[in-house]
Amino acid sequence: MVRKEMHPLDLFKFCPKCGAPAFVENCEKSKRCTACGFVYYFNVSSATVAFILNERGELLVCRRAKEPAKGTLDLAGGFVDRVETGEEGVAREVFEETGLEVVETQYLFSLPNTYLYAGFLVHTLDQFFVCRVKDYAGLRAMDDVADSFWAPLEKENPEEFGLNSVREGVKRFLKEYK
């Protein structure tokens, strides 16, 4: 049996502009209100992921404190806020999750992902950055991170990372940038 993934717009029953219950499928990417004519296009959410290496070439790895993938390995990062650039978003997320201050970012690549939040499948475009931090003294697990630690790159097993895009990103980083 082939299981079709639910489209995120399936949960939207009312027009976000006028509130009418006349919000119908317009095409694969949008819904249209038959009452006011408003068309809403579904777009992905922007997220960031940080590769942070210390002076010994070890990677900063975090353990997820919350679902999805609670207890699995992760890298610092998260959703980009409404008026942030990717660089600003990754710096803020690194600080919120680890206490480390990012002083330089270098964009590497992006990967699509899905993130199940409160039963709602959020589609994301995850931007991967190499980040240099001011110093390593303030490292601590905060926000949605249960633990953070330095791990030798040669001992990293991408399969231990719980989120698909992070797992694939770690594989790519180890292959292309090591």
Which role does the model predict for each range below?
Residues 140-170:
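NUDIX/MutT-family hydrolases
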Residues 109-137:
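Active-site-adjacent beta-strand/loop module that shapes the phosphate/pyrophosphate-binding cleft
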Residues 1-11, 156, 170-177:
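A broadly conserved sequence feature marking short terminus-proximal activation segments
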Residues 35-59, 79:
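Conserved N-terminal beta-strand and adjoining loop/helix that marks the start
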Residues 2-5, 54-96:
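Conserved Nudix-box catalytic region and its N-terminal flanking loop in Nudix hydrolases
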Residues 8-12, 29, 46:
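Short metal-coordination and nucleic-acid-contact micro-motifs, chiefly zinc-binding Cys/His arrays
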Residues 23-24, 41:
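Short functional micro-motifs and their immediate structural scaffolds
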Residues 15-18, 33-36:
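Short cysteine-rich clusters marking metal-coordination/redox-active sites
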